[in-house]
């Protein structure tokens, strides 16, 4: 029996007045029913493996701001992509770390077909054709000022 009285303000009513003395939790009682009504499911199909790429050979360079994460040379990036595919991860996202000597005000090195990210994309796709590769065409790794855009008269355009 519900003892709800409209005269009471909402904040003054307790749970029993709203639902009765019984709280219906039957959908959460057993594992099978919780799984049936679950709204979100996270699986390996939802994962994207980030790979940070640098020039060179056989080098793992720690990223101080992300403990346990490394910048990898192309050869090691390919191995990580192979590892991701073996684990069933459908895609990787690659992020370049471009040497300062290759950066300029306009990020022109991004257009070089032989830049580190373009070479990494080709090498990974050749070695692991079934994996998706997500690349970012951001300018910040390629500009000397580090902004994700072209800087003109102190304004990013």
Regions found by a protein language model. Give the residues of each.
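Glycine-rich, proline-tolerant flexible connector loops at the mouths of alpha/beta enzymes
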Residues: 60-74, 87-115, 142-143
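Short, well-ordered coil/turn segments that N-cap beta-strands
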Residues: 44-47, 88-91, 128-131
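N-terminal small/glycine-rich loop or linker at the start of catalytic domains
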Residues: 42-69, 134-157
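Alpha-helix-loop-beta-strand connector modules within alpha/beta enzyme cores
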Residues: 103-137
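Non-catalytic positions within long, well-ordered alpha-helices that form the structural scaffold/packing
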Residues: 82-85
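Generic structural hydrophobic/aromatic packing signal, biased to beta-strands
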Residues: 49-51, 92-94, 124
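N-terminal amphipathic alpha-helix/helix-capping segment at the start of soluble metabolic enzymes
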Residues: 2-60, 64
């Amino acid at each position: 029996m519900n003892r709800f009285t409209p005269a009471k303000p909402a904040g003054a009513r307790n749970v029993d007045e709203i639902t009765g003395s019984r709280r219906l939790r039957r959908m959460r009682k057993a594992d099978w029913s919780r799984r049936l009504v679950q709204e979100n499911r996270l699986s390996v199909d939802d994962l994207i493996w980030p790979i940070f790429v640098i020039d060179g050979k056989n080098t793992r360079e720690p990223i101080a701001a992300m403990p346990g994460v490394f910048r990898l040379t192309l050869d090691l990036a390919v191995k990580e992509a192979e590892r991701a595919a073996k684990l069933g991860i459908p895609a990787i996202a690659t992020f370049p770390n471009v040497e300062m000597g290759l950066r300029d005000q306009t990020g022109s090195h991004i257009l070089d077909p032989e830049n580190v990210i373009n070479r990494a994309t080709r090498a990974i796709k050749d070695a692991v054709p079934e994996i998706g590769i997500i690349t970012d065409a951001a300018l910040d790794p390629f500009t000397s000022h580090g902004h994700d855009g072209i800087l003109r008269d102190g304004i990013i355009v």
